[in-house]
Amino acid sequence: MPSLPNYLRSKRKQSSYSQEEVAFLLGLKGMDKGGKVSRDENYSRIPTLETALAYEAIYGKPIRELFAGLYEQIADEVSSRAKILSYRKSETRDSKRQQALSELALRHYKPVA
């Protein structure tokens, strides 16, 4: 799995929670609760949407901030696909759709330096 930054560990430490306390707040069960939190913090696994939303509730930060690296990767992929779709649909008469695709394609555009 690629190394993508997330901010779970720093937010947990700012909140003074232990991994076991976060695991309890997440509703994790089993012997390795703290280990599951550690794997999320180290990006050894991608948490479920339910778990990601629970992290948002615990730390009061949006998912896209807590998982910034993953968000940027996904946003770039969506932007690339929007460019392709926009090109494919360039001959369509639906200007609203074309405008929406163009905006999506440019939303996460990062010029190559």
Whereabouts are the PLM-identified features?
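Conserved hydrophobic/aromatic packing and binding residues within compact polymer-binding modules
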Residues: 8, 19-23, 34-40, 66
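Recognition helix of helix-turn-helix/homeodomain-like DNA-binding domains
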Residues: 27-47
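Short basic helix-loop element that most often maps to the first helix and adjoining turn
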Residues: 5-27, 79-91
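Short, charged recognition helix plus adjacent turn
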Residues: 57, 67-113
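A short, Lys/Arg-rich alpha-helix, primarily the initiator
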Residues: 1-15, 106-113
